[in-house]
Amino acid sequence: MRFTVKQIAWLKVFLHLAGFLPLVWLFWAGHQGYFSADPAKDIQHFTGRMALKFLLATLLVAPLARYAKQPLLIRIRRLLGLWCFAWATLHLTSYTLLELGINNLALLGSEIINRPYLTLGMICWVILLALAATSTQAMQRKLGRRWQLLHNFVYLVAILAPIHYLWSVKIVSPQPIIYALLAVVLLACRYKKFRQWWR
């Protein structure tokens, strides 16, 4: 049984809630003092993990639609990608305002240059910005074949983002490793596509 247009619409509502409600929880948790002695780090890690979750969900759509023979699932991919960018932007903002502080914004450039894991994170964010800005059908028509070439850079983000996460934690825990392995699996699902690039 294939999804109907109406079912996809309801799925989009659910996914919007999945993207928005964690933000509500984040504010509530901060107000209730739920975080540890270093709430800035907690918020940074939470927002970063949310961005990674939506990135992986975005990458899951195409193989899932293909293997499950559910072509309409492709319609949720843009939504997931935009939530990935939204959470990545919150992640960057939380680092800038909570870690550096509003009075030290001038240090952001040097921090990105001098800390390799921040360099990777910024590369990911810039790519996501470009993908979000060109995600509309109008931009797809305007860019033509270049649109697909640009959006293939999401695979670079899928490689760099888990490395950024692994590099940023002081104590390696199972969580960043799991995200990295999931990214590898989702990229491996596209091995035929990657092979065609090298022919």
Curated annotation (Swiss-Prot):
Can you name the source organism?
Klebsiella pneumoniae (strain 342)
Which topology term describes how it sits in the membrane? Multi-pass membrane protein
**Protein name in the entry:** Protein-methionine-sulfoxide reductase heme-binding subunit MsrQ
Biological process (GO) annotations held by this record are: protein repair
Q: Per the entry, which co-factors are needed?
A: FMN; heme b
Q: Which HAMAP family match?
A: MsrQ
Looking at the UniProt record for this protein, which Gene Ontology cellular component terms does it annotate, in alphabetical order? Answer: plasma membrane
Assembly behavior: Heterodimer of a catalytic subunit (MsrP) and a heme-binding subunit (MsrQ).
Where's it found, cell-wise?
A: Cell inner membrane
Highest taxon above the source species: Bacteria
Q: What sections of the protein cross the membrane?
A: 8-28, 54-74, 82-102, 116-136, 149-169, 171-191
* Record's keyword terms, sorted: Cell inner membrane, Cell membrane, Electron transport, Flavoprotein, FMN, Heme, Iron, Membrane, Metal-binding, Transmembrane, Transmembrane helix, Transport
**What does the UniProt cofactor note say?**
Binds 1 FMN per subunit. Binds 1 heme b (iron(II)-protoporphyrin IX) group per subunit.
Q: What does this protein do?
A: Part of the MsrPQ system that repairs oxidized periplasmic proteins containing methionine sulfoxide residues (Met-O), using respiratory chain electrons. Thus protects these proteins from oxidative-stress damage caused by reactive species of oxygen and chlorine generated by the host defense mechanisms. MsrPQ is essential for the maintenance of envelope integrity under bleach stress, rescuing a wide series of structurally unrelated periplasmic proteins from methionine oxidation.
> Which family does the similarity line name?
Belongs to the MsrQ family.
A Pfam family (short name) is Ferric_reduct
Annotated NCBIfam families:
PRK05419.1-4
Question: Which GO molecular function annotation, any one, does this entry have?
Answer: metal ion binding
Signal peptide location = none
